[in-house]
Swiss-Prot record:
Site positions (Required for activity): 373
InterPro entries: ATP_synth_asu-like_sf, ATP_synth_asu_C, ATP_synth_asu_C_sf, ATP_synth_F1_a_nt-bd_dom, ATP_synth_F1_asu, ATPase_a/bsu_AS, ATPase_F1/V1/A1_a/bsu_N, ATPase_F1/V1/A1_a/bsu_N_sf
Record note on quaternary structure: F-type ATPases have 2 components, CF(1) - the catalytic core - and CF(0) - the membrane proton channel. CF(1) has five subunits: alpha(3), beta(3), gamma(1), delta(1), epsilon(1). CF(0) has three main subunits: a(1), b(2) and c(9-12). The alpha and beta chains form an alternating ring which encloses part of the gamma chain. CF(1) is attached to CF(0) by a central stalk formed by the gamma and epsilon chains, while a peripheral stalk is formed by the delta and b chains.
Enzyme class: translocase
Name the record gives this protein: ATP synthase subunit alpha
Organism per entry: Ruthia magnifica subsp. Calyptogena magnifica
Main localisation: membrane
TM region(s), chain numbering: none
Cellular component aspect of the GO annotation: plasma membrane; proton-transporting ATP synthase complex
Membrane topology (UniProt): Peripheral membrane protein
Span of the signal peptide: none
Binding site for ATP: 169-176
Amino acid sequence: MQLNAHEISDLIKKQIEGFDFDAEVRTEGSVVSVSDGIVRIHGLADVQFGEMLEFPNNTFGMALNLEQNSVGAVILGDYLHISEGDVVKCTNRLVEVPVGEAMLGRVVNPLGKAIDGKDDIDVQGARPLEIMAPGVINRKSVDQPIQTGIKAIDAMVPVGRGQRELIIGDRQTGKTAVAIDTIINQKDSGIRCVYVAIGQKDSSVAAVVRKLEEYGALENTIIVTAGAASAPALQYIAPYAGCTMAEYFRDRGEDALIVYDDLTKQAWAYREVSLLLKRPPGREAYPGDVFYLHSRLLERASRVNAEYVEKMTNGEVKGKTGSLTALPIIETQGGDVSAFVPTNVISITDGQIFLETDLFNAGIRPAINAGLSVSRVGGSAQTNIIKKLGGGIRLDLAQYRELAAFAQFSSDLDSETKAQIDRGQRVTELMKQNQYSPLSIAEMATSLFAVNSGLLDDIEVNKVVDFEAALIAYMNANQILLMSKINDTGDYNDKISNELQAAIDDFKQNHTW
């Protein structure tokens, strides 16, 4: 078959007319150097701070240093396959993490990818890693309690919804145990929980997952983990990722709780990243913005008003307030709370629960130091009955610790001092609580009423714990209506006081422990 010149020109015209080409404009650069998870890139003129960068083999990084002739970025994951000369592309979007109900019950890395061996997560959307904290006008005062189920905390240092309460202490003093017990106690409260594990052993995180599953709290919890073997950049962004996931629930008019375990390791990771990026070091070799590292994270925990929720949901949710409560954990060295990072976080938060090694070793667990622990806003959110019955507990314990130290040097004590020491010993025993056994409001109120009314004065100190366990079992079995009323209303009046008195008197007369 022969084609003449006219047919050939027609074919060429058709080909030209049918040619479809969409011009794609993007900024590209090339890798100049790569080491220790830090990449120097040349040519990304339009990159913005915190932007997600695309590397070969579906690897992503984050731009942190914007210099005149180069860009310093951290790799979010494995970087061993990246080499000099590789092409780097801008994505024109900040680092994002997936959010939504589907994340509950799952273990994910800081980028939101499942690492629990189950199916992929069907995410409902994504949000930027870093979001501005709600403004002053959008906030509401903290006036609702979050029950930890731990007597010593709910009575002495209560936590409110939307509060930031620091848990601080040396290693192996029960900091994680307090946080996990609090999460377990939320399984029927409707409060969504996020547990962020930073720089921990994978075996430790697996143990936490097993415990939450055992007590039925995992289905209500998201676990974000950046283990000890993870890149420092992932440990640095892990708290922000967890916070973004928790804010999804707050902004929909729900209540959420987030635990950062722990921010000391995040500060170490950020220090490592900053030094590798050749940022000038300051005190203890931390960069100059280490305070801002934690303040911009913890300020995102808040209680927001209904107008804010309505705006964030585009009018879908009306008339509901939301809250995000933060329990950051800080590890101290040798009980030194005046070190750089601990003082920073203490100044940012709304109070602290100080756990002491000496108390822990003495068998007083949770090892809460009543004198150094404080809650700056939780008192206004405390349940009425716990507030009235537990008001003097903190003072009793603090005075007892002082008197006990003084009594070691003197054998001749007046009757009033002896009475205070005897009461303090019983209160100390009463504040002991086993791990994974949170108490309801009514159970807590029963214990506090017993010690406040002097009903423990004739109980031997070493029998107080057994007496309390038997009393609570008796109340749950024989005083169901009274316990339900206290749990439902949280009120305290003369009628409830008389009923509690009669019930405990009956127990002491007719039961053994």
